[in-house]
Amino acid sequence: MDNYKLQLQEFFDQAPDNDDPNFEHQTPNLLAHQKKGIQWMINREKNGRPNGGVLADDMGLGKTLSVLMLIAKNNSLQLKTLIVCPLSLINHWVTENKKHDLNFNILKYYKSLDADTVEHYHIVVTTYDVLLAHFKLIKQNKQSSLFSTRWHRVVLDEAHIIKNCKTGVHNAACALTATNRWCITGTPIHNKHWDMYSMINFLQCRPFNNPRVWKMLNKNNDSTNRIKSIIKKIVLKRDKSEISSNIPKHTVEYVHVNFNEEEKTLYDKLKCESEEAYVKAVAARENENALSRLQQMQHVLWLILKLRQICCHPYLAMHGKNILETNDCFKMDYMSSKCKRVLDLVDDILNTSNDKIILVSQWVEYLKIFENFFKQKNIATLMYTGQLKVEDRILAETTFNDAANTQHRILLLSIKCGGVGLNLIGGNHIVMLEPHWNPQIELQAQDRISRMGQTKNTYVYKMLNVEDNSIEKYIKQRQDKKIAFVNTVFEETLLNYEDIKKFFNL
């Protein structure tokens, strides 16, 4: 316990910030919030316990440039930085380096890498997949320069990717050797406090990186306030409204949809089937083996997925074909209630402005349904999904953002691709075609249009089936609770070192 007490005291008694008075003049082209953020990062590396932290500004506020300017404060070849990011973001780091004339030697690392190669670069940028592959190599006692190099700084971009501390990619990130460690993410917490623990573990934030200590902090009453007192020390999070009153207005509205008679019959019957399957799965807990119980619960989850898809278009839930006498609604060209509402909304925007629109879904097949509808109306669209090669995604992004290109005013976006570093400020309307269980993933997609450089007011339309027994209504209720929890965690708190020490009976 004495060791914990010492670590607690070191964490809370960190040296005060000591800003460089000349920094303002050295960085005239940065915005005020970026200058403040970089000063905070410099102080964390000098005096922080741990050395580093979490830069969690809203998406679109220039976190990439802030990190590059931090590196520029001391760009010696001996003080190397490793940046780990999704594959789609590697070129973004290189582009930002060129755009701001920083002249770093940047190595984009995909394949083999040796120590001699690393010596010639200020920055090595690699992917989470490559990091994990090399982690497996060292577990087999093979060589990897990613892990044999002592980095001056390791930066995890889109760091929420390691939020599950039981995964290999989390363990790989924690195994890197570095003097300073940084997590960059606009959404550090998605669902629960343990999302934050994964970053605290990577940062080596003692004593809280000990899972037993973190578990104790999450016990009993006031756990959120205890977590907040720690987060306040190591996380810098600003939202767009704090940064500037001049940012374009951002409007979010729900667009309600009801079933037609045919869709409602299909949905109600499948919901009854789902309820029966759930009752059967619960009963199996006592009477059948573990494998059988697991299979039955997986079937229930599959049926819930089909309910969600029927709320969008019956074609996505072909399982229901044997429920109705007619199969017309299962055809791809069937105009579902939600599709009609979306198309009316899009037509209105196209006909009353020169704005561009993004349609977002979890299902590529749903996007293809809309692609087909727009083709029938002679409206050109762009597609951006994980099925595209990286160069094709870049082309779609560039084409959509080109103000001179008035032919392609609609982009069909897979939500899995829409949350990671993508810049779509060429558009200013986003239609979320269905709710996602994780509201943070929705927010990431929405921020593709609401970010630095956007000059127009932005609009988000959330399509929601509002039938009494709608699975979409239930998902929205869950979303509201999760968002309220995340907001609570990042509010100000009055707890301090003495409060935490008392909690541990130190």
Swiss-Prot record:
InterPro entries: Helicase_ATP-bd, Helicase_C-like, P-loop_NTPase, SNF2-like_sf, SNF2/RAD54-like_C, SNF2_N, SNF2_RAD54_helicase_TF. A motif (DEAH box) lies at residues 157-160. ATP binds at A56, D57, D58, M59, G60, L61, G62, K63, T64. Keywords: ATP-binding, Helicase, Hydrolase, Nucleotide-binding. PROSITE patterns: HELICASE_ATP_BIND_1 (PS51192), HELICASE_CTER (PS51194). Its EC number is 3.6.4.-. It holds the Pfam family Helicase_C. Residues 44-206 form the Helicase ATP-binding domain. One of its GO terms (molecular function) is ATP-dependent activity, acting on DNA. SMART domains: DEXDc, HELICc. Belongs to the SNF2/RAD54 helicase family. This is Probable global transactivator. It comes from Autographa californica nuclear polyhedrosis virus (AcMNPV). The lineage of its organism: Viruses, Viruses incertae sedis, Naldaviricetes, Lefavirales, Baculoviridae. The gene is GTA.
